[in-house]
Amino acid sequence: MSDDYRETDPTRQPEDMGEGSLRPETLADFTGQKASRENLAIFIEAARARNEALDHVLLHGPPGLGKTTLAQIVARELGVGFRATSGPVIQRAGDLAAILTNLQPRDVLFIDEIHRLQPAIEEVLYPAMEDFQLDLIIGEGPAARSVRIDLAPFTLVAATTRAGLLATPLRDRFGIPLRLVFYTPEELRAIVSRGALKLGMRLTDDGAEEIARRSRGTPRIAGRLLRRVRDFALVSKHAVVDRALADAALGRLEVDERGLDAMDRRYLKRIAEHHHGGPVGVETLAAGLAEARDTLEDVIEPYLIQEGLVLRTARGRMLGEAGWRHLGLTPPASQVDLLSSLEQDDSAP
C-alpha cells in the first residue's frame, strides 16, 4: 500500500505543525461557503446526537476552495479519527481493504481525487459505503472463494474537481453532496486578514483588499500570495504591508488586477491571436500551450469562465467580451456577430 496513506489525530493535523497554518480548524472559523457550511453543521450535530457515523460526504468544485480543510474539520467536529489518502495511490483492492479494516467506529476516511479511482476499486467501495461490508475474492482459479468482512461504521468524505467523471452508482451513495463555489472579495479579505494575524504580519485593510481582489476567488491562492507579499515586505524592510506594497509585490509576481497570471494571459492570447477568438477545441489549445488538457480544465478555465473572460460552447472555447477587453484588443466583426448570436440563444426561452 502507498506511503501516501496517512493517519492523523483530528486535533493535530500535519498542516498545523509548521510555521502556522492558515487553515481554519472549526466550522465557526471557516469563512465562506455559507449554505454548505451551515448545512454541514446541522448534519454533524444530528450525527453526534444519534451517536452514529455521519453520512458520506462528497465535496466537489474547483481546486483550492477548501475541500481538504472541510474534511479535516468534519473529523474535528465529530471528535473522531481522520484518515487520508487519494484516488491515484490506491492501486489494488487490497490497498483499500487495508485502509477500511483499520478504521475505528465513526472515523472519517478522506479520499482526494476520488474520480481517479480505478473502476474495479470503486466496485469494492460500494458495499463498504452502503452496508459497511467488504466483499473480497481470496485466491485464484478454482480455489478462489468470496469472503465478506464486516467494517466499523465510518464516514467517507471524498473530494473531486470533476464530479461528472464519477460513476453514477458511486455518486449516488453520497448522502451529503456539497458543491463549493468561488469566494467573494469580502470573504477573501477576511481570510487574508486572519492569515496575516497568524503569520505575524501587519497588514492594512486596503492591503488585505488588494491581495483578496487578485486571488481569483480562491483561498489557496490568497494564502500563497499573502506569503509572497510577506517575503517582499521582509526583504524591502517594510514593517507594514499596505495597498501600494501589495500592488508592487503582486506586480513582480505577474499577477494582474483581476488575479490573472502569466499562464492565464497566455491562454487568452492564444485564443485571440492564433484562433481569432475561437471557437477552438480544448485539445488544440492544450497542444498549442504545451499543457495537459486536465490542467486547462481544472486549473485555468474555471475562473476565466466564471468571470466571463472565456465562453465554453458546443464548438469549443471562445473569448468573451470581457476577455477581449482584458487583453486591450478589439474583437473582429465576425466575433462580435458570433457573441451577439450566443447572447440571443442564451436569452431565448
UniProtKB/Swiss-Prot annotation:
Gene3D superfamilies in UniProt: 1.10.8.60, P-loop containing nucleotide triphosphate hydrolases (3.40.50.300), Winged helix-like DNA-binding domain superfamily/Winged helix DNA-binding domain (1.10.10.10)
Pfam families: AAA_lid_4, RuvB_C, RuvB_N
Region (Head domain (RuvB-H)): 257-349
Positions that bind Mg(2+): T68
Annotated spans, Disordered: 1-25
Enzyme Commission number, as recorded: 3.6.4.-
Location of the region described as Large ATPase domain (RuvB-L) in the Swiss-Prot/TrEMBL record: 1-183
Cellular localisation: Cytoplasm
Sequence positions that bind DNA: R293, R312, R317
Record GO biological process: DNA recombination; DNA repair
Major site of localization recorded for this protein: cytoplasm
Region entry Small ATPAse domain (RuvB-S), spans: 184-254
UniProt-annotated binding residues for ATP: L22, R23, G64, K67, T68, T69, E130, D131, F132, R173, Y183, R220
Record's compositionally biased regions (Basic and acidic residues): 1-15
Single GO MF annotation: ATP binding
UniProt KW tRNA processing keyword: no
Catalysed reactions listed for this entry: ATP + H2O = ADP + phosphate + H(+)
Entry comment, domain topic: Has 3 domains, the large (RuvB-L) and small ATPase (RuvB-S) domains and the C-terminal head (RuvB-H) domain. The head domain binds DNA, while the ATPase domains jointly bind ATP, ADP or are empty depending on the state of the subunit in the translocation cycle. During a single DNA translocation step the structure of each domain remains the same, but their relative positions change.
Function field: The RuvA-RuvB-RuvC complex processes Holliday junction (HJ) DNA during genetic recombination and DNA repair, while the RuvA-RuvB complex plays an important role in the rescue of blocked DNA replication forks via replication fork reversal (RFR). RuvA specifically binds to HJ cruciform DNA, conferring on it an open structure. The RuvB hexamer acts as an ATP-dependent pump, pulling dsDNA into and through the RuvAB complex. RuvB forms 2 homohexamers on either side of HJ DNA bound by 1 or 2 RuvA tetramers; 4 subunits per hexamer contact DNA at a time.
HAMAP family from the UniProt entry: DNA_HJ_migration_RuvB
Family designation: Belongs to the RuvB family.
Quaternary structure annotation from Swiss-Prot or TrEMBL: Homohexamer. Forms an RuvA(8)-RuvB(12)-Holliday junction (HJ) complex. HJ DNA is sandwiched between 2 RuvA tetramers; dsDNA enters through RuvA and exits via RuvB. An RuvB hexamer assembles on each DNA strand where it exits the tetramer. Each RuvB hexamer is contacted by two RuvA subunits (via domain III) on 2 adjacent RuvB subunits; this complex drives branch migration. In the full resolvosome a probable DNA-RuvA(4)-RuvB(12)-RuvC(2) complex forms which resolves the HJ.
Name of protein: Holliday junction branch migration complex subunit RuvB
Gene name tied to this protein: ruvB
